[in-house]
Protein backbone atom coordinates (compact mmCIF):
# COMPACT_ATOMS: atom_id res chain seq x y z
CA UNK A 1 0.00 0.00 0.00
CA UNK A 2 1.24 3.50 -0.72
CA UNK A 3 3.26 2.43 -3.77
CA UNK A 4 3.41 4.98 -6.56
CA UNK A 5 4.49 4.46 -10.14
CA UNK A 6 6.01 7.26 -12.20
CA UNK A 7 4.36 8.24 -15.45
CA UNK A 8 6.00 6.23 -18.19
CA UNK A 9 4.48 8.01 -21.17
CA UNK A 10 5.19 11.64 -22.10
CA UNK A 11 6.16 12.80 -18.62
CA UNK A 12 9.43 11.16 -17.59
CA UNK A 13 11.10 14.51 -18.23
CA UNK A 14 8.04 16.61 -17.42
CA UNK A 15 6.44 15.09 -14.30
CA UNK A 16 4.06 18.00 -13.83
CA UNK A 17 2.52 17.81 -17.30
CA UNK A 18 -0.68 16.04 -16.18
CA UNK A 19 -1.40 18.39 -13.27
CA UNK A 20 -0.66 21.47 -15.39
CA UNK A 21 -3.07 20.22 -18.05
CA UNK A 22 -5.81 20.00 -15.42
CA UNK A 23 -4.94 23.45 -14.08
CA UNK A 24 -5.54 24.81 -17.58
CA UNK A 25 -9.22 24.03 -16.99
CA UNK A 26 -9.37 27.50 -15.43
CA UNK A 27 -9.74 28.84 -18.98
CA UNK A 28 -13.31 27.53 -18.90
CA UNK A 29 -14.33 30.10 -16.29
CA UNK A 30 -12.34 32.93 -17.85
CA UNK A 31 -13.92 32.36 -21.25
CA UNK A 32 -17.42 32.26 -19.76
CA UNK A 33 -16.88 35.71 -18.29
CA UNK A 34 -15.58 37.10 -21.59
CA UNK A 35 -18.36 35.55 -23.67
CA UNK A 36 -21.02 36.48 -21.11
CA UNK A 37 -19.98 40.15 -21.14
CA UNK A 38 -20.23 40.18 -24.95
CA UNK A 39 -23.71 38.58 -24.86
CA UNK A 40 -26.44 40.56 -26.61
CA UNK A 41 -28.74 42.15 -24.06
CA UNK A 42 -28.38 40.62 -20.61
CA UNK A 43 -26.94 37.19 -19.89
CA UNK A 44 -28.39 35.78 -16.68
CA UNK A 45 -26.51 33.31 -14.50
CA UNK A 46 -29.90 32.24 -13.14
CA UNK A 47 -32.00 31.96 -16.27
CA UNK A 48 -29.48 31.19 -19.00
CA UNK A 49 -27.61 27.91 -19.24
CA UNK A 50 -23.88 27.61 -19.85
CA UNK A 51 -24.63 26.15 -23.28
CA UNK A 52 -26.49 29.34 -24.23
CA UNK A 53 -23.06 30.97 -24.47
CA UNK A 54 -22.21 28.55 -27.28
CA UNK A 55 -25.53 28.83 -29.11
CA UNK A 56 -24.76 29.81 -32.70
CA UNK A 57 -27.99 31.70 -33.47
CA UNK A 58 -29.97 34.62 -32.10
CA UNK A 59 -33.58 34.26 -31.03
CA UNK A 60 -35.77 32.30 -28.67
CA UNK A 61 -34.40 28.90 -27.68
CA UNK A 62 -36.23 26.71 -25.13
CA UNK A 63 -38.10 29.74 -23.88
CA UNK A 64 -34.94 31.82 -23.40
CA UNK A 65 -33.61 34.61 -25.57
CA UNK A 66 -30.12 33.71 -26.75
CA UNK A 67 -27.59 35.71 -28.75
CA UNK A 68 -23.90 35.04 -28.15
CA UNK A 69 -21.59 36.85 -30.61
CA UNK A 70 -18.56 35.01 -29.22
CA UNK A 71 -20.15 31.56 -29.43
CA UNK A 72 -17.15 30.18 -31.32
CA UNK A 73 -14.88 31.11 -28.42
CA UNK A 74 -17.20 29.38 -25.96
CA UNK A 75 -17.42 26.23 -28.03
CA UNK A 76 -13.63 26.19 -28.38
CA UNK A 77 -13.48 26.45 -24.58
CA UNK A 78 -15.77 23.41 -24.22
CA UNK A 79 -13.52 21.47 -26.59
CA UNK A 80 -10.36 22.50 -24.75
CA UNK A 81 -11.90 21.58 -21.40
CA UNK A 82 -12.86 18.17 -22.74
CA UNK A 83 -9.33 17.59 -23.99
CA UNK A 84 -7.75 18.65 -20.70
CA UNK A 85 -10.10 16.40 -18.73
CA UNK A 86 -9.35 13.36 -20.89
CA UNK A 87 -5.61 13.82 -21.39
CA UNK A 88 -5.01 14.90 -17.81
CA UNK A 89 -6.85 11.80 -16.56
CA UNK A 90 -4.66 9.55 -18.71
CA UNK A 91 -1.43 11.11 -17.46
CA UNK A 92 -2.28 11.61 -13.78
CA UNK A 93 -3.66 8.06 -13.45
CA UNK A 94 -0.12 6.79 -13.99
CA UNK A 95 0.98 8.45 -10.74
CA UNK A 96 -1.27 6.36 -8.54
CA UNK A 97 -1.45 2.82 -7.27
CA UNK A 98 -3.02 0.68 -9.93
CA UNK A 99 -6.27 -0.82 -8.66
CA UNK A 100 -9.80 -1.11 -9.94
CA UNK A 101 -11.02 1.98 -8.14
CA UNK A 102 -8.42 4.37 -9.54
CA UNK A 103 -8.82 2.88 -13.01
CA UNK A 104 -12.60 3.34 -12.93
CA UNK A 105 -12.37 6.84 -11.44
CA UNK A 106 -9.91 8.24 -13.95
CA UNK A 107 -11.60 6.40 -16.83
CA UNK A 108 -14.95 7.97 -15.98
CA UNK A 109 -13.35 11.40 -15.80
CA UNK A 110 -11.74 10.84 -19.21
CA UNK A 111 -15.09 9.76 -20.70
CA UNK A 112 -16.70 12.82 -19.12
CA UNK A 113 -14.07 14.85 -20.97
CA UNK A 114 -15.10 13.29 -24.26
CA UNK A 115 -18.68 14.26 -23.47
CA UNK A 116 -17.59 17.86 -22.87
CA UNK A 117 -15.91 17.70 -26.27
CA UNK A 118 -19.32 16.87 -27.78
CA UNK A 119 -20.84 19.94 -26.10
CA UNK A 120 -18.44 22.17 -28.02
CA UNK A 121 -18.63 20.30 -31.31
CA UNK A 122 -22.44 20.15 -31.29
CA UNK A 123 -23.86 23.41 -29.83
CA UNK A 124 -27.31 23.16 -28.26
CA UNK A 125 -29.12 24.56 -31.33
CA UNK A 126 -27.50 22.15 -33.81
CA UNK A 127 -27.78 18.42 -33.10
CA UNK A 128 -29.47 18.72 -29.72
CA UNK A 129 -29.46 14.96 -29.06
CA UNK A 130 -25.66 14.77 -29.28
CA UNK A 131 -25.29 17.99 -27.29
CA UNK A 132 -27.51 16.67 -24.51
CA UNK A 133 -25.71 13.32 -24.52
CA UNK A 134 -22.38 15.11 -24.30
CA UNK A 135 -23.50 17.33 -21.43
CA UNK A 136 -24.93 14.38 -19.51
CA UNK A 137 -21.57 12.58 -19.49
CA UNK A 138 -19.70 15.08 -17.28
CA UNK A 139 -22.83 15.77 -15.25
CA UNK A 140 -23.22 12.09 -14.38
CA UNK A 141 -19.92 10.30 -15.00
CA UNK A 142 -17.66 13.16 -13.96
CA UNK A 143 -19.34 13.54 -10.58
CA UNK A 144 -19.45 9.79 -10.00
CA UNK A 145 -15.72 9.83 -10.77
CA UNK A 146 -15.19 12.30 -7.93
CA UNK A 147 -16.91 10.02 -5.45
CA UNK A 148 -14.95 6.97 -6.60
CA UNK A 149 -11.63 8.81 -6.48
CA UNK A 150 -12.39 10.12 -3.00
CA UNK A 151 -12.63 6.50 -1.87
CA UNK A 152 -9.64 5.03 -3.70
CA UNK A 153 -6.96 7.70 -4.16
CA UNK A 154 -4.31 8.00 -1.48
CA UNK A 155 -5.07 11.56 -0.44
CA UNK A 156 -5.11 13.49 2.85
CA UNK A 157 -8.44 13.17 4.64
CA UNK A 158 -9.51 16.82 4.11
CA UNK A 159 -8.99 16.52 0.36
CA UNK A 160 -10.80 13.17 0.26
CA UNK A 161 -13.76 14.72 2.08
CA UNK A 162 -13.76 17.73 -0.25
CA UNK A 163 -13.71 15.43 -3.28
CA UNK A 164 -16.52 13.24 -1.95
CA UNK A 165 -18.75 16.16 -0.94
CA UNK A 166 -18.23 17.85 -4.33
CA UNK A 167 -19.48 14.76 -6.15
CA UNK A 168 -22.43 14.14 -3.84
CA UNK A 169 -23.67 17.74 -3.92
CA UNK A 170 -23.42 17.90 -7.70
CA UNK A 171 -25.32 14.63 -8.17
CA UNK A 172 -28.03 15.76 -5.75
CA UNK A 173 -28.55 18.97 -7.68
CA UNK A 174 -28.43 17.01 -10.93
CA UNK A 175 -31.59 15.22 -9.79
CA UNK A 176 -33.24 18.60 -9.19
CA UNK A 177 -31.99 19.82 -12.57
CA UNK A 178 -33.36 16.81 -14.46
CA UNK A 179 -36.73 17.07 -12.71
CA UNK A 180 -36.95 20.83 -13.39
CA UNK A 181 -37.01 21.67 -9.67
CA UNK A 182 -34.96 24.81 -10.10
CA UNK A 183 -36.32 26.81 -7.20
CA UNK A 184 -34.76 30.23 -6.66
CA UNK A 185 -31.55 29.06 -8.36
CA UNK A 186 -33.13 29.09 -11.80
CA UNK A 187 -32.12 26.70 -14.56
CA UNK A 188 -28.77 28.42 -15.00
CA UNK A 189 -27.92 28.56 -11.34
CA UNK A 190 -28.72 24.95 -10.63
CA UNK A 191 -26.86 23.79 -13.74
CA UNK A 192 -23.76 25.56 -12.48
CA UNK A 193 -23.98 23.80 -9.13
CA UNK A 194 -23.95 20.54 -11.10
CA UNK A 195 -21.21 21.49 -13.56
CA UNK A 196 -18.75 23.67 -11.67
CA UNK A 197 -17.63 21.48 -8.72
CA UNK A 198 -15.77 18.94 -10.86
CA UNK A 199 -14.02 21.62 -12.92
CA UNK A 200 -12.99 23.48 -9.76
CA UNK A 201 -11.79 20.15 -8.38
CA UNK A 202 -9.64 19.52 -11.47
CA UNK A 203 -7.92 22.87 -10.93
CA UNK A 204 -7.41 22.36 -7.19
CA UNK A 205 -6.20 18.81 -7.68
CA UNK A 206 -3.72 19.94 -10.33
CA UNK A 207 -2.39 22.63 -7.99
CA UNK A 208 -2.27 20.12 -5.14
CA UNK A 209 -0.17 17.67 -7.14
CA UNK A 210 2.32 20.35 -8.13
CA UNK A 211 2.83 21.52 -4.56
CA UNK A 212 2.93 18.38 -2.40
CA UNK A 213 5.16 15.37 -2.03
CA UNK A 214 3.21 12.98 -4.26
CA UNK A 215 5.63 13.09 -7.13
CA UNK A 216 8.60 12.76 -4.77
CA UNK A 217 7.16 9.57 -3.27
CA UNK A 218 7.28 7.94 -6.68
CA UNK A 219 11.04 8.26 -7.01
PLM feature segments, named:
Residues 1-13:
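Short, Lys/Arg-rich, polar N-terminal cytosolic tail immediately upstream
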Residues 61-91:
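Individual transmembrane alpha-helix segments
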Residues 148-219:
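Terminal transmembrane helical module of multi-pass membrane proteins
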Residues 87-113:
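Cytoplasmic juxtamembrane regions at transmembrane-helix boundaries
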Residues 109-149:
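Membrane-proximal helix-loop-helix units in multi-pass membrane proteins
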Residues 42-70:
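Extracytosolic (periplasmic/ER-lumenal) interhelical loops and adjacent juxtamembrane/interface segments
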Residues 12-42:
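N-terminal signal-anchor transmembrane alpha helix
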Residues 21, 25, 80-87, 140-149, ...:
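Hydrophobic cores of alpha-helical transmembrane segments in multi-pass inner/ER membrane proteins
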